[in-house]
């Protein structure tokens, strides 16, 4: 919540606003509900209707999951609910850290960082066969501000891409109850 306020006060889009604009650039057919699980007062109402969503996109944040604050624990708990009730989840950056942690994986401070761009992300064999990378060049760059990385993947998770800084730039896994 404070991070969003700080962005807005200096005229910068929040992560959520930027993500919505990016998606709307490609299609106007999506409908969005925005939830901030760290501070949303009506989170219990949102949990009740999770299974009605076609999918969920969980974007970035400047938080570090290993700091284990009440705000972070609330997000992990909400992600666990999402993993039970939402069939398709695209978890980007911080979202991947929350999803991996909620599913039993572990995040640590990375040995390096991405400031603005994650360079030379390389899709591995598993990634080349995954629909998210259909038609994508085997090496690519992506916008990123990242200081942390996946240390341990959840059970049944597959790494899809990596680079020199992060051994896991992308992963796929299913959560079973």
Where are these regions (language model features)?
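Short glycine-/acidic-enriched loop or helix-start segments at secondary-structure transitions
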Residues: 6, 67-68, 100-102, 154, ...
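Short C-terminal domain-edge/linker segments immediately following a structured domain
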Residues: 23-30, 63-68, 86-91, 121-123, ...
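Short, solvent-exposed loop/turn segments at secondary-structure junctions
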Residues: 2-3, 39-40, 62-64, 97-98, ...
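Active-site phosphate/pyrophosphate- and oxyanion-stabilizing loops and adjacent acidic/basic residues
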Residues: 17-21, 97, 147-148
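N-terminal beta1-alpha1 cap of cysteine-dependent amidohydrolase-like domains
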Residues: 1-77, 81-87
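Cysteine-nucleophile active-site neighborhood
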Residues: 61-127
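A structural signal for short, well-ordered beta-strand segments and their strand-loop junctions
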Residues: 34, 90-92, 159-161
């Amino acid at each position: 919540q404070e991070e969003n306020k700080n962005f807005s006060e200096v005229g910068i889009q929040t992560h959520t606003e930027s993500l919505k604009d990016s998606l709307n650039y490609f299609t106007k057919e999506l409908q969005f509900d925005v939830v901030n699980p760290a501070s949303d007062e009506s989170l219990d109402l949102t949990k009740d209707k999770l299974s009605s969503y076609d999918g969920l996109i969980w974007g970035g944040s400047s938080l570090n999951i290993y700091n284990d604050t009440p705000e972070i624990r609330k997000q992990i708990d909400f992600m666990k609910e999402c993993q039970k009730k939402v069939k398709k989840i695209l978890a980007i950056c911080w979202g991947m850290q929350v999803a991996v942690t909620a599913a039993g994986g572990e995040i640590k401070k990375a040995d390096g960082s991405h400031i603005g761009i994650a360079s030379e992300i390389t899709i591995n064999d598993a990634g080349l066969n995954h629909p998210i990378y259909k038609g994508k060049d085997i090496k690519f760059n992506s916008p990123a501000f990242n200081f942390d990385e996946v240390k341990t993947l959840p059970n049944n998770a597959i790494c899809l891409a990596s680079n020199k800084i992060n051994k896991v730039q992308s992963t796929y896994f299913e959560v079973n109850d």
